[in-house]
Amino acid sequence: ADNALLKAAEVLRRLGGHRPTPQLDDLWIGLLDALGMEGDMRAALMDPERVWDTAVALGDLGGKMLHACSHMSISPNIVQGGQKINMIPDAVHIDVDIRTLPGQDTDYVRAELEAAIGDLADQVDIEVLSDRSASRSPHETPMWGVIESAVKAADPTARVHPGLIVGGTDARYYRPHGATVY
């Protein structure tokens, strides 16, 4: 008999080992600038082939933050399957927490999940429970100019850079209505 729990275990293994495509965009470059990343470290963090391992290697020195700011995260957190000890499960439900970066939509997420799952993708139903894509506000605004001026008044050598908060804030509720949120 086809044991869905065994298949789910393989899906989980593949999700856990998947490395989503890094997003090394203008926000990423600005973050590296703001952090003063230079030389070999910057080169490694700008290399799509090395950014994952470099961020992980930094560990508590900001590695987790750098990793989350450069990659969509995939975290399978809840698994439910089987009813009784003497029944082979025919279905398993896996809840996966996915944190996207700005510009990564549902189609992008689905493509990454299918790439991770590989040849099992046609045997898996992907259901989107929440579609709250990451958002960002433009920083070429009068409000951004005021923020920069205030920071420079306090410290003329300070660098002001749009940040990326991984996780969630209330900004996701206001931006769709046209609000600029920093």
Model regions and ranges:
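Short amphipathic alpha-helices in soluble, non-transmembrane regions
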Residues: 2, 11, 108-117
